[in-house]
């Protein structure tokens, strides 16, 4: 079984240095390309979006860059964004980085299916990232005339009010 990388504010090597066949112009770093794109699109800061949503706004010292693992090697500890990237990001964290940093605050113990009784603490999307993803899915479903939301607008999940994406995937897989 191939597990995905955890959500965090670090970038794996293949994304830090994209091949020239993918990134024909500089920079070759996907994270840097995303940050520049967000700047050019005029995306609001993560803190601005959290405030507009009425959810907890992360403080600068809670927005950490680095790997989010249980056993952090010495010298690889995550560091606050302002210390890593400068005061320009004080109360002004790029939205993409904010969403990734938010996952450090929201973790869940998950059982590893291939090992008996072993669980890991895994990050999950927080209020800002989770809501953006949910609204994109809902927008796609409302935009699809064959979607259940358009076919039967009064439909509600049989599982009740607490129906998660995990439940939806399990249902789709027949579990």
Regions found by a protein language model. Name each.
Residues 1-175:
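Terminal regions of secretory-pathway proteins
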């Amino acid at each position: 079984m191939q597990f995905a990388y955890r959500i965090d504010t670090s970038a794996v090597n293949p994304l830090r240095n994209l091949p020239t066949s993918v990134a024909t112009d500089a920079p070759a770093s996907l994270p840097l390309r995303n940050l520049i794109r967000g700047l050019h699109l005029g995306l609001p800061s993560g803190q601005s979006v959290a405030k507009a949503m009425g959810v907890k706004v992360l403080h600068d010292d809670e927005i950490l860059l680095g790997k989010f693992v249980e056993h952090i090697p010495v010298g690889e500890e995550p560091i606050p964004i302002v210390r890593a990237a400068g005061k320009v990001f004080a109360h002004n964290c790029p939205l993409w980085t904010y969403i990734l940093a938010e996952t450090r605050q929201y973790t869940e113990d998950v059982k590893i299916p291939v090992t008996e009784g072993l669980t890991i603490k895994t990050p999950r999307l927080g209020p800002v990232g989770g809501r953006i993803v949910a609204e994109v899915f809902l927008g796609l479903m409302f935009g699809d005339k064959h979607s259940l939301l358009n076919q039967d607008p009064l439909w509600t999940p049989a599982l009740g009010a607490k129906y998660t994406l995990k439940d939806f995937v399990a249902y789709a897989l027949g579990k």
